[in-house]
Amino acid sequence: MMAYLLDSKKVCHVKAIFDSIERSLGTFSFSSVFSLVLTDRGGEFRNPAALECGQENLIRTSIYYCDPMCSWQKPHCEKNHEYIRKICPKGTSFDDYSQEDITLMMSHINSSPRQSLGGMSPLKLAKLMLPSQVIDYFGLTEIPDDEIVLTPALLQK
């Protein structure tokens, strides 16, 4: 899972991130990695056609929505959201965080072994399944188990 700071929760900001990823990875790699995107019904995802179509109006992904109040439809994302809330408790302002801070947080979260993955971390599994250029692009680094921090101390300045 990746996370990005947005200027606001608008479709245009999410589209700009999708476009940037597609430009960097190429349309084929983008479509291979993100063949579908499962999301909630937040306003930033309200225009699926804008997100599904990329460079030269080619379809790059398919957007699917979870039903309202059905977090069980994307349990692995919800586990990551729990970890995010451990590091950034509800009410925490993201104004003082940089994208580098968010990427560091996601490196720690993605390095955390999961029982649902047979004891592997999401990042280890991603390294087995995705081209290295994809992992490198997102700037995620594997954190040794004994150095993983999933508390607010991770981002204290």
Describe each PLM feature range.
Residues 49-61:
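Short, surface-exposed basic-aromatic patches at helix termini and helix-loop junctions that form
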Residues 39-41, 51, 63-87, 95-107:
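RNase H-like two-metal-ion nuclease catalytic core shared by retroviral integrases
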Residues 90-157:
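C-terminal domain-tail junction helix/linker
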Residues 2-28:
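Active-site beta-loop-alpha junctions of metal-dependent nucleic acid enzymes
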Residues 1-4, 65, 90:
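Short small-residue beta-strand/loop micro-motif enriched in glycine and branched aliphatics
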Residues 28-47, 67-69:
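Acidic/histidine-rich, metal-coordinating catalytic segments
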Residues 9-14, 20, 82-86, 107, ...:
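Metal-centered catalytic cores of metalloenzymes
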Residues 3-5, 38, 118:
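Structured core elements
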